[in-house]
Amino acid sequence: MNRELTRRHIECQRSLFFLIFLLLGPSLYAQMAQGKAKFLGNILGNSQPDPDFATYWNQVTPENSGKWASVEPTRGLMEWSGLDAMYQYARSRGFVFKQHNFIWGRQQPSWMDSLPPDQQKLEAKKWISQYGQRYPDTQFIDVVNEPLHNQPSYKKALGGDGSTGWDWVIWAFSTARRYCPHSKLLLNEYNMLAGGKDLEQAITIIKILKRRNLIDGIGVQGHGLENVSDATIRSSLNRLGSLRLPIYISELDLNIADDDSQQKRYKSLFPILWHHSAVKGVTLWGYKQNHIWKSNAYLLRADGSERPALVWLKEYMSH
């Protein structure tokens, strides 16, 4: 018990430092999308202060702090401190905040696997309802993350495939709609911009949710686009746009080690995403060297200097 209390105390101290550091930092910034109709955002890590964030970005997605396993690693013991700090940071700056995520087959609480189905469903409901009570002003929520590729082990408890093939997803969105009535609800999936089977399967789920008025937008992950043709990306965006729902590019990164090659790919790809009429915002998945999921996708070097792609992006967004 003492070890658990000590660990929780340290986590609270780290999160408090994170919040104070960001709130008391310089107040004058010029984010790249400031004053524009669309946001250009990024992720914030767990408890690491990032004084450079507001220099570039005006939308916040928690990288890990909003995942259920991070908030409730032990059943009934909620660790909100990291998420509290990021939510308050976004609100204090006037930045858009997106919760990532409610239901995902990875980084789910390990203790869920030992529960009977009725308890699994109850715990999932509690998780969503507690979030809604604590963060009522959340603008966007990734309700279900990667349903095509990473389904939760407890999906049968939420309705399983059912008559639609995706009843568990319907349950998640219905529950989120009930407890987060002021948030826009998103389905977040990868590989859609590459076209093909994944795109069509995602569209099937989106249509099921749209018929029930349960979905407000489409989260389109931007991983793995280094070698996807521009024509395929345009076609996929148009296909998604035909659903008449806003599109949010949710996890953009270009994992390219060579500076010139990365800049060239940004120059060809980013305008396609940014200027598509259905796309209402773009979120990158990290930007700092050594603090990013894809090791060569960084835009800001460890010494604080900007890679050519970031220099170009700043210039492009200034017009």
Q: Which residue ranges define each predicted feature?
A:
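Aromatic- and acid-rich polysaccharide-binding/catalytic face
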Residues: W57-S65, Q139, N145, L186-E189, ...
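Acidic-and-aromatic substrate-binding clefts and catalytic sites of carbohydrate-active enzymes
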Residues: L40-D52, W68-S81, Q108, L148-P152, ...
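Bacterial N-terminal signal peptides
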Residues: S15-S27
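Substrate-binding cleft and catalytic face of glycoside hydrolase catalytic domains
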Residues: T55-P73, G82-A194, I256
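Bacterial N-terminal signal peptides that target proteins for export
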Residues: R3-F17
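Short, acidic/polar
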Residues: L44-Y56, L122-Y131, K197-L209, R265-F270
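Aromatic-rich peripheral "rim/lid" segments of glycoside hydrolase catalytic domains that contact
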Residues: E72, S110-D113, Q130, D142-W166, ...
